[in-house]
């Protein structure tokens, strides 16, 4: 059936308990294994889409939100329709499915708005997966259990699937807490989403002073905070989960849950990626976070007794990302600039250099 969300017409099906056969075939469905909503994104990278879908089929979550923007050209439409067919015909377990299929290309941010309006009207928690994020099978149960355990604990803003170190050997539980994490494969609550989009902090000089003090060792975060306080876009992007999750740490003193063993691998660093370059144009220190090894976790989970941020993990994670490390930061900027020039991306390199060099403008 088609439904209208705001001013946009999209396609949605199998909502509110309605069930229909897949591909015209009636068959006995396997039972779901994990009672958790999952949002997946259809795009134009077949090597990513199929690999992720096979993991989802093994995990068998109870609810799927399938977001699919339209193509920008005939070739993209061909791939998108193939991926839609895969989801339409190969979901072989009992699963409530919400399909958000656009009939044209609306773009990243408009599609996110449409999805969020539907998603958060149906559920109060959700795993968020982009098409290039490959989880371990146990990741789904890991998220489901912690989403329930911490649903009313407002000290926690999200559950991360990624551990930047791969394994945190010193951690004595199956997960720990951090003020720094990753949005690659996160699970959040509606209460987390309800914190998004609030930029009133920019109107209060006192709050801005506090935020400047809190971010004195993170120039990148401070530039974003200043930029979004007065503009909808920064470096060509609207504020999204990456900004708001980080802001939750600085502005709301919230923490993120990080698994002891990494459970997410991003395999989508290519010219089809929205937020990252082709991997050959990334500094070597950043390349390590892509195509990471993933691990399965054993159950029952061993929970930490105390809610304390792991400062050593934060330091190591921030060095990988060149946060709070000016020498590493500038060395990578130079390396990135050189790689872009080498591979014929001079215009893009100059734009990135401008954004890096110009100071943050306070409101």
Locations of regions flagged by a protein language model:
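Peripheral/terminal regions associated with large enzymatic or DNA-binding modules
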Residues: 24-129, 133-363
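Generic extreme N-terminus detector
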Residues: 5-6, 26
């Amino acid at each position: 059936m088609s439904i209208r969300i705001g001013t946009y017409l999209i396609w949605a099906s199998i909502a509110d308990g309605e069930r229909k056969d897949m591909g015209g075939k009636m068959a006995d469905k396997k039972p779901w294994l994990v009672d958790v909503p999952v949002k997946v994104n259809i795009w134009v990278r077949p090597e990513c889409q199929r690999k992720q879908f096979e993991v989802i089929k093994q995990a068998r979550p109870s609810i799927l939100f399938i977001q699919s923007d339209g193509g920008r050209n005939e070739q993209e439409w061909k791939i998108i329709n193939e991926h839609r067919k895969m989801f339409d015909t190969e979901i072989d377990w009992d699963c409530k499915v919400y399909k958000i299929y656009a009939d044209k290309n609306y773009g990243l941010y408009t599609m996110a708005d449409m999805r969020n309006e539907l998603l958060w009207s149906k559920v109060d928690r959700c795993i968020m997966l982009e098409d290039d994020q490959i989880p371990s099978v146990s990741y789904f149960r890991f998220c489901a259990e912690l989403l329930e355990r911490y649903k009313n604990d407002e000290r926690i803003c999200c559950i991360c699937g990624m551990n930047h170190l791969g394994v945190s050997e010193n951690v004595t539980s199956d997960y720990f807490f951090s003020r720094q994490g990753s949005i690659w494969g996160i699970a959040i609550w509606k209460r987390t989403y309800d914190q998004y989009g609030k930029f009133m902090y920019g109107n209060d000089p006192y709050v801005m002073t506090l935020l400047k003090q809190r971010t004195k060792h993170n120039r990148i975060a401070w530039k974003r905070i200043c930029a979004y306080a007065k503009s909808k876009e920064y470096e060509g992007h609207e504020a999204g989960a990456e900004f708001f999750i980080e802001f939750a740490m600085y502005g709301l003193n919230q923490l993120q849950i990080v698994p002891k063993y990494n459970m997410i691998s991003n395999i989508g660093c290519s010219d089809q990626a929205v937020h990252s370059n082709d991997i050959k144009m990334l500094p070597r220190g950043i390349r390590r976070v892509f195509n990471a090894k993933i691990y399965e976790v054993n159950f029952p989970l061993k929970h930490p007794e105390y809610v304390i941020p792991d400062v050593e993990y934060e330091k190591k994670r921030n060095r990988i990302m060149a946060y709070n490390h000016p020498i590493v930061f500038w060395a990578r900027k130079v390396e990135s600039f050189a790689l872009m020039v080498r591979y014929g991306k001079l215009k893009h390199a100059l734009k990135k250099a401008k954004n890096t060099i110009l100071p943050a403008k306070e409101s």
